[in-house]
Amino acid sequence: MNNPRYLLDTNICIAYKKRKPGIPERIDSLATGEAAMSVVTWGELVLGAEKSQQRDKSFAILKRVREIIPVLGIDDAVGDHYGAIRGELEKAGKPIGPNDLWIAAHARAQEASLVTNNTREFERVAGLALEDWTS
């Protein structure tokens, strides 16, 4: 798979899963390979399904989501970006959450726009392109 144009944050994948207005249409209109999710996002989605009162239904929905939105693994380049971003944010005294840090590093390493409705958190990361499809 070539680098995706968009890396979808957990909140956007949840909005897709829940069929929130505008999100499914936007994702479904993309060409194959234009959007993906980080394995970190996938882990957060699996955790949500594990904790769900409707576990089996949640996992069935996640299976369908994964068929549409591929999951990208982490490689050395992501680790390089993670270290650089974390160092920059710690020096500035503006850290972000650990999973968000990995997701930001993954998007930046892929040269993909991170699609999130949590732009306030991610705008601290230099060189990270952001899009909010919920507004």
What are these regions (language model features)?
Residues 1-38, 47-64, 91:
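Short, well-structured N-terminal submotif of metal-dependent ribonuclease cores
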Residues 9-10, 45, 82, 107, ...:
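Generic structural signal for small/hydrophobic residues in well-ordered secondary structure
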Residues 12-13, 41, 78, 102-103, ...:
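Alpha-helix capping/helix-boundary segments
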Residues 39-40, 75, 134:
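Residues at the C-termini of beta-strands that transition into short coil/loop
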